[in-house]
Each structure stands twice: as structure tokens, then as C-alpha cells.
């Protein structure tokens, strides 16, 4: 998370790759620059923004050490997700940029609950249009997170999907998806990718998705034809 930079003699924070330093959203000058860049793209005619890990732009200002889980690494998520000023920053973004253009906005929000989602994607339009949440994707998580061959228990998946449908009803908007570039293929994970059942599994998964309330997302992941990734 913390990387030493020899040129400046200082450490910088990166929640992901060391080539991706986290921006300091506490700094109003940084926010100004971000909003200026967004405005530039809006004036070029973009249709919207998919905001990567937007729930992580506000950190616990004390920067406490994360709990060591399974002797592997510190868990930063309680201190970087849904931080104390995240909604304040998004409302500022909305007022200064998003509300001035005809856009669609979706925020990738790791660690989000339905209660938090009601703020991010509230129907009064003060922040974003919708969120990408991960609770249904985490029903098989184990010691190594999503890196497992464990098949999901559909009872758990159904319970999570029902919760998001019911809790957001009339209060916020959700996105609908089964996989993406960070997740295993849906047919391999939630269905059966054998030659006999691959097609019917895909139809079953698609039917389930499109009968729910929300905006469906269908991604075409660049993988060699005929290669089915089980993880």
C-alpha cells in the first residue's frame, strides 16, 4: 500500500499497483483538476463515466494498519472503502460537472452495502446513476478471495440478489451483471460450461439477469475463442 519514492524521498499510497498512486481527494486542487478533466471529456461529447473503485476516494485520515488476515496481508478495506467524505466529494462532482451534461454514470463500489448504495445511486440524482456492487460475486469467496474453484450455492446467490432488489426498491438504482474483466466467466462459475450444457446455462443466466430490476451490463471479454476459464 505504501511505496517509497527515491526521487522525492517520500512515501505514496497505492491501493492497487504501485504504478497507480491514489489521488489525494482531500486536496481541493486535486479535485479541481479531476473535475476540469471530466468537463473536458464531457464537452467532447462522451456519453458517461464508469468510475473505477469510486467508493475508495476517501480514506480514514488516521491511516491505521489493517488487520492481518490468514497470515497473508493487512486488510485495508475498512479504512479505504466508503470513507468519511466520499459522498461529499461525489456531490461536489455532481454539482460541478455531472449535472451540467446529459450523462450516464456508474460507480464501481467495492465494500458497498445496500444502505450505502442508497446514497451513491439515490433517485434524486445528487451523486451517481447506479453502482456496481460485488456482494453476489463474493458468495464463493474463501481464504484467497475469488481465486477458488468452489461453486456458488444458489440459495446464497438468490438471497443476495433478492436483498438488493428489495432494499433499493423506490430508493436507488442498481446495475445488473454476472461477470466482468475482474471476475470468472459467468457460465463457468454459475452454470455448467461443458459442451452439453454451456448454451442452456448461458440462456438461464441471461434470463435471470434480464428479469431483474436495474440496468443490465453485457461485456465482451477478449479471450481466445473456445477457451473457458474455470476460475
What are the language-model segments listed below?
Residues 1-231:
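Active-site and adjacent substrate-binding regions of carbohydrate-active enzymes
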Amino acid at each position: 500500500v505504501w511505496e517509497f519514492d527515491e526521487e522525492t524521498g517520500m512515501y505514496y499510497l497505492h491501493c492497487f499497483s504501485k504504478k497507480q498512486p491514489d489521488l489525494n481527494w482531500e486536496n481541493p486542487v486535486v479535485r479541481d483538476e479531476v473535475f476540469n478533466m471530466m468537463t473536458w471529456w464531457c464537452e467532447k461529447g462522451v456519453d458517461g463515466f464508469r468510475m473505477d473503485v469510486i467508493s475508495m476516494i476517501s480514506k480514514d485520515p488516521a491511516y491505521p494498519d489493517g488487520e492481518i488476515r490468514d497470515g497473508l496481508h493487512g486488510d485495508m478495506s475498512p479504512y479505504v472503502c466508503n470513507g468519511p467524505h466520499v459522498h461529499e466529494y461525489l456531490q461536489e462532482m455532481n454539482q460541478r460537472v455531472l449535472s451540467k451534461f446529459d450523462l450516464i454514470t456508474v460507480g464501481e463500489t467495492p465494500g458497498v452495502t445496500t444502505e450505502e448504495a442508497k446514497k451513491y445511486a439515490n433517485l434524486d440524482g445528487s451523486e451517481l446513476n447506479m453502482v456496481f456492487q460485488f456482494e453476489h460475486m463474493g458468495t464463493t469467496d474463501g481464504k484467497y478471495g475469488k481465486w477458488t474453484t468452489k461453486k456458488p450455492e444458489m440459495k446464497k446467490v438468490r438471497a443476495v440478489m433478492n436483498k438488493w432488489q428489495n432494499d433499493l426498491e423506490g430508493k436507488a438504482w442498481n446495475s445488473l451483471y454476472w461477470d466482468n474483466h475482474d471476475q470468472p466467466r459467468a457460465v463457468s462459475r454459475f452454470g455448467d460450461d461443458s459442451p452439453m450444457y454451456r448454451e442452456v446455462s448461458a440462456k438461464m443466466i441471461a434470463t435471470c439477469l434480464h428479469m431483474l430490476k436495474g440496468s443490465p451490463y453485457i461485456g465482451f471479454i477478449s479471450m481466445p475463442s473456445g477457451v473457458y476459464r474455470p476460475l
